[in-house]
């Protein structure tokens, strides 16, 4: 008779951004469902933002005190959504101040494992000293993290040979096979201009942090699966000299949305009035910064496409202030502009939604495709263009055409792309492929559970797992 598996205590510690915290919470629930105890580490305000989880699960929330004395950091700012893009480096400075409280937690609770995020360069040496096993969990897909970073030694030593925007429009030298997963020139210029350094007290840039986080890990966990990008997952292991475990896509379900039944009832009532697969859902993320001209161009495109749409605009876009004059009045019979939180998974799972205009954050793209919704892609920065290239190659969505040098686009091209993906006969390939890949990969619960189970089995028996 087989011996019962030991019950573990696993601590998880995501970066201070909802796009990281939510998949870490998904992972926590999966681990807890196997009978293990999970300590979810963050700050008080971030913990309060998370959706409720079943009291049957042994998931304990551990609040660490984030410094409120860092210059230029707004009062009560505890997540990337609380600060402008130019001030995220100050949040990293405050985050680095959590090391002492984190050490005290490890000393007192003695978890078997710490699962930490890509910016947590100081976590692995603390954990190793205290005898805690270490896994880095990257919430990006493998191709994106390889293109962005490269081998750990290159990132730590600052030896990335790519010094200009033109260097980013071709594959990096550490990718040994042909690929079209690269930046376009206007995207590469944005990467070069991204505010990641130059703040007093923040001595390490993001690539150096990631490199050190890799080096200190025993295993790399990636939010992906072999059915999507096998060659990239294998390359990640080769580049970092570590075992890589794809954990699956951790797709959310409508039940995972935070409780706000009143909001959902209002939205559902509007969606229920429309035909199946006819509504265009537009959401460009909670933290994406886009220009006035881009908002105006998208708005005019939605007006021209003549399809019903539901557009969620969050604070980073300054919402309706940027919309064209008279836009709301002209589209009021078929369009909704929503400026508050929305239950995105519930919207995407509704039968009336036939297309998703997305910035191509990995989590958002996975959500849309887990419900079989084809994508209209408008990537903005960071990993988003790389995700768009990966998914475009699968014909499960179409990018809005943009000038490769300056990123300009026309409202007509927005309308044409939306109609092509959602209603026109020529775009049937995208609708069919999105539905097919939902069944095969993105919404395949059995497949995704197998990946998660494989990782948990590794935690339970790491020697055999490697």
Swiss-Prot record:
Indicate the segments annotated as coiled coil, or none if absent: none
Region forming the signal peptide: none
Tell me which UniProt keywords the record has, alphabetically: Glycosyltransferase, Transferase
EC number(s) stated in the UniProt entry for this protein: 2.4.1.-
Tell me where on the tree of life, at the top rank, the source sits.
Eukaryota
Q: Give, as one word, the top-level EC class.
A: transferase
InterPro entries from the xrefs?
UDP-glycosyltransf_plant, UDP_glucos_trans, UDP_glycos_trans_CS
Q: Which residues bind UDP-alpha-D-glucose?
A: 286, 342-344, 359-367, 381-384
* Gene Ontology MF terms: UDP-glucosyltransferase activity
Q: Which family does it belong to?
A: Belongs to the UDP-glycosyltransferase family.
Spell out the protein name for this chain: UDP-glycosyltransferase 91B1
Protein species of origin: Arabidopsis thaliana (Mouse-ear cress)
The organism that produces this protein has a lineage beginning with: Eukaryota, Viridiplantae, Streptophyta, Embryophyta, Tracheophyta
